[in-house]
Every structure is written in structure tokens, then in C-alpha cells.
Regions:
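Beta-strand-enriched cores of mature, soluble protein domains
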Residues: 2-159
Length: 159
């Protein structure tokens, strides 16, 4: 069997997404950490915020805790790599650690491309399902209305 026959005999799975949460995350002023071989480094403090479950996850809501940070690298090609680490505290008291690795590209594009892979570490049984799914993120600025970003976490499923 050649590769074309093999690929035709195994139909591709479809990927769907479901909105798990939307977060409004207040951020501090960007700090310049200097140049590195990978690019210009920055640090953006996370000051806090709120998150709200998507339509199918109404019981998933709470606060974004202050104390996290977004480490950024501005590469020589103009693309930004962001690595944010912070905690969210659900209204039931559970603490959920979020690692959000974002790629931002606005070079010659009409709209800014800002998508991520979000790793969730939840200890509770109520939100343990977040540990077992791939979560795709989107990132949008809330400026000038608020010195914040809007992060949405989308659960990726296969059909």
C-alpha cells in the first residue's frame, strides 16, 4: 500500500473547540530585561483579574491571583514569544496553575496573530478534567479601556 492509499483509507479526524473560560488579566508595566541571544527580553507582572467559565462550564469561575508574570522574548524576526505562569483561584477555593505559551505575530498582517498552548495543573476532582485536555488559547489586548489582556481557553476535541 502506498502512502496515498494509506492516507485515503484512514480519514482525518476533525478538531473542534469549546470555550472553557475567558479571563480578564490585569498587567503591570513591561520591564526591559535586556538583550539575549534569543532576542530582547521583557517581563510583565500579572496583577490579578477574573475568569468566567464558557457556556458549558458555568461553574468554572473565580479570580486570577496577583504574583504571576509573563516573560517575553522579542525575536529578531519581530515575532514575540510569551511564557506566562500564574494561578487562578476558583470560587470553590481550588487553586489552578496556568502556564500559557503564546506566539504573537503582527508582521505585515491585517490582524495580529496571538495564539497559545495552555497547560493547566488542577488538583481538585471538580476541575481535574482540565489536566487531561489540550487547551488552545487566544490573547487580545483590553487597552486602552483597561491595562489588561483577555485570555480565552478553548478545549480541543477530536471527532
Amino acid at each position: 500500500m502506498n502512502h496515498d492509499e494509506l492516507l485515503n483509507s484512514v480519514p482525518p479526524m476533525t478538531v473542534t473547540t469549546t470555550l472553557a473560560w475567558s479571563a480578564i488579566i490585569k498587567v503591570g508595566e513591561r520591564q526591559n530585561l535586556g538583550q539575549s541571544p534569543a532576542g530582547q527580553r521583557f517581563l510583565v507582572p500579572i496583577l490579578g483579574g477574573n475568569f468566567y467559565g464558557g457556556p458549558q462550564f458555568k461553574n468554572f469561575h473565580g479570580k486570577v491571583l496577583p504574583g504571576g508574570a509573563d516573560r517575553q522574548i522579542l525575536r529578531s524576526d519581530g515575532v514575540k514569544e510569551l511564557d506566562a505562569l500564574y494561578e487562578m483561584k476558583a470560587d470553590n477555593g481550588d487553586i489552578i496553575t496556568i502556564q500559557n505559551q503564546v506566539l504573537v505575530d503582527q508582521n505585515g498582517l491585517d490582524e495580529r496573530y496571538a495564539m497559545s498552548v495552555i497547560k493547566v495543573m488542577a488538583a481538585s476532582t471538580e476541575f481535574n478534567w482540565l489536566n487531561r485536555r489540550l487547551i488552545i488559547g487566544t490573547l487580545q489586548s483590553a487597552r486602552p479601556r483597561l491595562n489588561a489582556v483577555i485570555v480565552r481557553g478553548w478545549i480541543a476535541d477530536q471527532k
